[in-house]
Amino acid sequence: MFQGKILEYDNDGIVCHDTDDRLIWNQSYEMTAPELSVCEQYLAVYDRGGTFIYIMSERGLVKKIETATPIERVCVARQGTVAVLMKEDDVSYVRLYDKKGQELASGEFYQEKGSFPVDIALAPDAQKLAVDMLDVTKGKTCSTVTFYNFGSVGQNEIDNNVGTYSYKNTMISELVYTESGKLLAISDAGLIWFDGAQKPAPKKQIKFEREIQSVFYNNKYVGISYSDTKKENSWHIKVYDMNGKTVMENDTEIAYNRIELLDNNEICVRDDYNCELFTIHSIRKFRYTFDRQLYNVLSGSDGQNYTLVSVSYTHLRAH
């Protein structure tokens, strides 16, 4: 979903239409591995391993950017600014561009120094950038999260670095900035929350006690699921708020291929034909087996209506 609209994208282009299937805009391109980054009124669609970025708004194309180096990751901020992680040979590059394509900041990382960037996250105001570095030179993994501040506070620091935090025997695979400005780091060992308007610092850490099957999140919550050792063919779901407090727990017997938080903050668990919905208060709200393959589930604004997108037909309203 993007501004209440439905997005469809593939290697040839991206289409935005409303829930009544009316076309809003259509942008064509040629990409091998298109991926999306969304923040409020802007989205960036980019070619992972390619060199093209399309910054889009609810009205359509804002700017097309071509990079000189293959792209690994793009993050967009609420005003359309994008942070771009690129890599070529043993050198990684980070560039910051405004929505007109003008370069705002840049940096380089050399793998010969022992570590390399795994992920980046751009704060919604585009003033802070977090970089996740992985070091495996000594036979053990060590992840480091470094924060850069491009505002007045960061100008007083060397290379705009306002904080660096290392975690031994840990591999942080993903960084996520929420709309409130908190950063979530997802690792093989657990979840770490960082907070701070100018100089973010660790505020909460939860260690995983067993092997995690899935981690899913939105701007308000982050959830995990793992196999229930007490029940065969059952998975336990646990959801935390962005302060690290447990807010929801329940079990599902669907051998799902998709688990996610919907726009109304309900948890949707589904495979190709089965769908289950839980409220954020742990109540199982809905379960059904469909005779057509499910493509997507979208929540309405009132918490009662849903759009179920199937292969054969597009819209079905369910209460």
Task: Describe the residue ranges of each PLM region.
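Short, solvent-exposed loop/turn segments at conserved positions within beta-propeller repeat blades
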Residues: K87-D90, T137-S143, K230-S234
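Short loop/turn segments that connect beta-strands within beta-propeller blades
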Residues: T19-D20, S57-R59, D98-K100, G151, ...
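A short beta-strand motif characteristic of beta-propeller blades
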Residues: R22-Q27, G60-E66, L104-Y110, I158-Y165, ...
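Short beta-strand elements that form the blades of beta-propeller/WD-repeat-like
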Residues: F2-Y9, Q41-D47, G80-K87, Q127-M133, ...
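Non-cytosolic head/periplasmic domains of membrane-anchored proteins
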Residues: N26-P124
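Repeated scaffold domains used in trafficking and secretory/extracellular systems
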Residues: M1, M31-V38, T69-A77, G114-A121, ...
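Solenoidal tandem-repeat scaffolds enriched in leucines and small polar residues
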Residues: Y93-T170, E174-T178, L183-L184
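Conserved small/polar residues in nucleotide/adenosyl-binding loops
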Residues: T314-H319
